[in-house]
């Protein structure tokens, strides 16, 4: 399934107008946005994936008016009416989903998260809910009716942890057919119900880091930096009459060591590391690559980013999987193309020494590869 995907947003609205008017602000329904033919999924194939212990899956079923969720892997998939089987990171499994995700190229790679596939029976869905991120809901097969409510950040804060079974008054309703796309911004309640069996919806999710997430990640980043000075407090103030009083010198020492660094170089480095952090659960197979073996390759080959690699550029620095890699000035154009296009042609035997050094490290870590990713579907 190597079909190239073209999301025809331009038929409805330009990417710049979409970002200005809709992204993060209001829902948008796009009819006949893509050609979905050739991407059909069968129940046997999807159920087989749900039995795989390396694939995250769950079933949401509505029985007697109540929602029940069970988590995979499943020895036997129990799937009846009003049920949905969800498979996460489907873009690593399904080539069509991967191409679909990559086609939304007006959103920076650093905000790409994953594609979740839902396979529903008639009446199935995940229940009314609201998300803290932007999502494109692509109808793959079958039909689904969507009810959309008004965007309400305050309501999102006060609902349950998973924000499911959210009660809201629909303000819009859409009937999604194969090839249709519904964009839903954060904090916007929505509820989709399948109108047929074997109904497939691809949920393309994007990262929307919260202020709390950024602060927590920044603290972890600072902890990982490990201040090599290893200063100890040893400057007591002498005050015999108020022994319960915390010494000013101790309070000052603590303030000094708990204040966030204001060095812009540190903050910029954190931004690059944070936004290139690979998806949770990403796995990279290390290899033993030698310089001699690399330089012996005297034919032009396609070098690719590992499908799980996150690579970003920030303030002229290159970050890959939360690592800042040194790139010589003469190699910058090479890495700009690799990071932006996710692949590049290279003849290793003709590569200069500085480029070879970085290539060997990245190949050894499994961050880049000469091999094309093998999709299961």
Protein language model annotation of sequence segments:
Residues 350-364:
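Short amphipathic alpha-helical interaction segments
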Residues 218-276:
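Long, charge-rich alpha-helical interaction segments
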Residues 2-21, 34-180, 188-236, 372:
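Active-site region of the double-stranded beta-helix
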Residues 261-337, 360, 371-377:
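Acidic, low-complexity/disordered tracts enriched in E/D and polar residues
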Residues 1-27, 321-330, 364, 369-376:
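Fe(II)/2-oxoglutarate
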Residues 330-351:
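Short acidic, hydrophobic short linear motifs in intrinsically disordered regions
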């Amino acid at each position: 399934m190597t079909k190239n995907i073209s999301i025809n947003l331009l038929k409805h609205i330009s990417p710049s107008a979409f970002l200005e008017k809709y992204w993060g602000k209001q829902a948008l329904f796009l009819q006949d946005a893509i050609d979905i033919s050739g991407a059909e999924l069968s129940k046997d194939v999807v159920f087989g994936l749900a039995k795989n212990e390396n694939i995250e899956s769950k079933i949401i079923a509505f029985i007697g008016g109540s929602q029940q969720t069970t988590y995979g892997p499943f020895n036997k998939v129990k799937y009846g009416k009003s049920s949905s089987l969800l498979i996460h990171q489907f873009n690593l499994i399904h080539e069509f989903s991967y191409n679909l995700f990559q086609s939304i190229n007006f959103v920076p790679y650093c905000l790409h998260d994953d594609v979740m596939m839902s396979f529903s029976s008639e009446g199935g869905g995940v229940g009314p809910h609201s998300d803290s991120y932007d999502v494109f809901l692509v109808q793959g097969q079958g039909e689904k009716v969507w009810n959309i409510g008004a965007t309400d950040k305050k309501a999102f804060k006060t609902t349950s942890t998973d924000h499911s079974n959210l009660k809201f008054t629909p303000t819009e309703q859409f009937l999604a057919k194969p090839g249709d796309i519904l964009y839903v911004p954060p904090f916007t309640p929505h509820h989709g119900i399948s109108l047929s069996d074997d109904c497939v919806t691809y949920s393309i999710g994007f990262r929307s880091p919260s202020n709390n997430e950024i602060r927590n990640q920044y603290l972890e980043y600072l902890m990982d930096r490990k201040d090599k000075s290893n200063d100890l407090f040893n400057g007591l103030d002498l005050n015999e009459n108020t022994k319960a009083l915390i010494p000013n010198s101790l309070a000052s020492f603590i303030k000094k060591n708990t204040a966030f660094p204001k060095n812009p170089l540190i903050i910029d480095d954190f931004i690059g590391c944070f936004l290139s952090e690979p998806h949770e659960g990403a796995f990279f197979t290390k290899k033993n690559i030698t310089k001699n073996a690399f330089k012996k390759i005297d034919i032009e080959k396609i070098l690719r980013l590992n499908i799980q690699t996150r690579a970003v550029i920030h303030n002229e620095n290159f970050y890959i999987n939360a690592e800042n890699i040194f790139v010589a000035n003469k190699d910058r154009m090479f890495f700009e193309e690799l990071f932006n296009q996710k692949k590049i042609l290279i003849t290793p035997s003709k590569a200069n020494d500085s480029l070879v050094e970085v290539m060997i490290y990245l190949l050894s870590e499994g961050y880049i590869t000469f091999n094309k990713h093998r999709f299961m579907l």
